[in-house]
């Protein structure tokens, strides 16, 4: 599975405290990605603390950001991807963390903290929750049937129209996440995936428009079951999701 694995390309999520009222009210309101926590952990937490957890989920950073920037979300903890942190911090939707109350900070992986610090200087508003890669998962049998000698070790599999067109017959799904897809497209074009100029973003846009007719759906969770059930043969997604589909 070709993947993005450098600092700017790692899909990170970070906890961020929003209010200080939850403990007093004996209720903690959490907004997280779907399938990102074992439900038994929530049950165990409530048994140990007596604090009730209200747990809601979303499928894209854009949904989370829209809700956060609108204000008054009511959530105490949310889990944005790292590249969205800076804009949200600047908008004032988070409170600073009190490191003295976070007794497990010493267990954080320094390398990942440094990467997140590019978006959250000094890790003042967030702590690492999860990291992984974004890449391509595929059904080997279906891909071999639709495209013999497919370039399975290359992003050309989904970004080259001559390949994408043939794979459209068995189905391609792609993450509904510009923060993941655009850097991948830039990298495929030989451009710095961190590039942010209008010219470079347009290059990625033009590439994506060429293969857009061959993409069945843009979504950030449905591709898991679709790939597992054989409804599609290729999925651009998060590594954990691809592993789950396998």
Predicted regions and their residues:
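Paired acidic/hydrophobic, glycine-rich loop segments that form the ligand-binding mouth/hinge
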Residues: 76-80, 216-217, 233-238
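A ligand-binding cleft/hinge motif common to bilobed small-molecule-binding domains
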Residues: 84-87, 234-246
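Early extracytoplasmic/lumenal segment of secretory-pathway proteins
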Residues: 25-88, 225
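Sec/Tat signal peptide C-region and signal peptidase I cleavage site
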Residues: 18-24
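Bacterial N-terminal signal peptides that target proteins for export
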Residues: 1-9
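Extracytoplasmic ligand-binding site segments that recognize negatively charged/polar headgroups
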Residues: 79-85, 89-214, 219-228
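Bacterial N-terminal signal peptides
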Residues: 8-17
């Amino acid at each position: 599975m070709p993947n993005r694995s450098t600092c700017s390309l790692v899909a990170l999520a970070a906890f961020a405290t929003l209010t200080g009222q939850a403990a007093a009210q004996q209720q903690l309101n959490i907004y997280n990605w779907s399938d990102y926590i074992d439900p038994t952990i929530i049950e165990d937490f409530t048994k140990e603390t007596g604090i009730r957890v209200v747990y809601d989920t979303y499928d894209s950073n854009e949904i989370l950001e829209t809700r956060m920037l609108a204000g008054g979300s009511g959530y105490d903890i949310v889990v944005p991807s790292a590249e969205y942190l800076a804009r949200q911090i600047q908008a004032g939707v988070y409170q600073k963390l009190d490191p003295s109350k976070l007794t497990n900070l010493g267990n954080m992986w320094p390398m990942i903290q440094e990467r997140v610090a590019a978006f959250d200087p000094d890790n003042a508003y967030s702590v690492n929750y999860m990291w992984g890669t974004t890449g391509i998962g595929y059904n080997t049998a279906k891909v071999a049937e639709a495209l013999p000698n497919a370039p399975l070790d290359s992003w050309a599999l989904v970004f080259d129209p001559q390949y994408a067109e043939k794979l459209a017959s068995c189905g391609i799904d792609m993450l509904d996440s510009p923060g993941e897809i655009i850097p991948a497209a830039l990298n495929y074009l030989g451009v710095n995936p961190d590039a942010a100029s209008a010219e470079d973003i347009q290059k990625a846009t033009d590439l994506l428009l060429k293969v857009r007719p061959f993409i069945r759906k843009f979504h950030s969770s449905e591709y898991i079951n679709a790939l597992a059930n054989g409804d599609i043969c290729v999925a651009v997604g998060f590594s954990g999701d691809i592993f789950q589909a396998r």
